[in-house]
């Protein structure tokens, strides 16, 4: 129940202190739509309160409304320009709005405030990937791996970016670490690409087969994903004419095992 919509209570709860108290209660409980209404009313009276705009932005973000969230966070930034939390939220909004260049500029600002924040480093890497600057992305993923060598957070992006820039042995090393840990279908799929590009056909087929098995035997999905990655495979040096030959061997083996 939104207490302000109860006609008897509305006059009693319309002062700023009551609005803020109720808004904070809704916010902490995760009732973001109700909290948003209250914080927006408060913002009309408190133009210089960055926390109100932060919470308005967060409520919009929880609704998936990144444009309005961004607008609120930018207002908070004007009031408090070096707030790490706000800067990260602005960057997140830009990423979700498919504006990696703008996101990157804010993540770099966040990086200056907290140089060893792993999440910021990862997101900088992701922004470079979205701009297809894989070499630059690798620098940040390697920094994450250096700061947290046992965490494995950056292994997958390091492996994939290494493959895309032609560092196949490096990609292979990282996929071996991933496959020794807790691999999912996509890990075997991508590791198969690396082995295929290195000319290790039997190993590639084995990895592709494992990928299909872990995806509930969905060979149609596998073929669709393989076709989507064909340009990257060709860029890695695989001849287009070799792809149908490998796929025939793979599918024959799968059919034969049924």
Language model segments and positions:
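Register position in tetratricopeptide repeats
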Residues: 28, 62, 96, 130, ...
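Terminal, low-structured helical/coil segments at or just beyond the last alpha-helical repeat
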Residues: 215-258
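Start-of-helix register in tetratricopeptide repeats
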Residues: 17, 51, 85, 119, ...
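Conserved structural position within tetratricopeptide repeats
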Residues: 43-44, 74-78, 108-112, 142-146, ...
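TPR-adjacent "capping" and linker segments in tetratricopeptide-repeat scaffold/adaptor proteins
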Residues: 1-18
């Amino acid at each position: 129940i939104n207490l302000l919509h109860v006609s008897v209570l509305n006059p009693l709860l319309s002062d700023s202190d009551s609005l803020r108290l109720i808004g904070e209660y809704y916010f902490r409980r995760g009732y973001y739509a109700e909290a948003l209404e209250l914080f927006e009313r408060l913002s009309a009276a408190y133009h210089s309160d960055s926390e109100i705009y932060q919470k308005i932005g967060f409520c919009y973000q929880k609704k998936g409304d990144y444009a309005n969230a961004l607008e609120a966070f930018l207002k908070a930034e004007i009031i408090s320009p070096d707030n790490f939390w706000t800067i990260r939220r602005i960057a997140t909004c830009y990423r979700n709005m498919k504006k990696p260049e703008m996101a990157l500029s804010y993540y770099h600002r966040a990086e200056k405030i907290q140089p060893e924040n792993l999440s910021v480093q990862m997101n900088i890497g992701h922004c470079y990937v979205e701009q297809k600057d894989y070499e630059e992305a690798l620098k940040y993923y390697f920094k994450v791996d250096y700061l947290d060598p046992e965490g494995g957070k950056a292994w997958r992006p390091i492996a994939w970016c290494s493959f895309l820039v032609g560092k196949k042995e490096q990609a292979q090393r990282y996929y071996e670490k991933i496959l020794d840990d807790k691999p999912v279908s996509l890990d075997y799929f991508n590791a198969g690409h690396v082995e295929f590009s290195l000319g290790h056909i039997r190993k590639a087929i084995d990895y592709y087969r494992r990928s299909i098995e872990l995806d509930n035997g969905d060979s149609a999905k596998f073929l669709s994903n393989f076709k989507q990655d064909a340009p990257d495979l060709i860029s890695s040096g695989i001849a287009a004419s070799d792809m149908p030959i490998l796929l025939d061997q793979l599918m024959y083996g799968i059919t034969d095992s049924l």
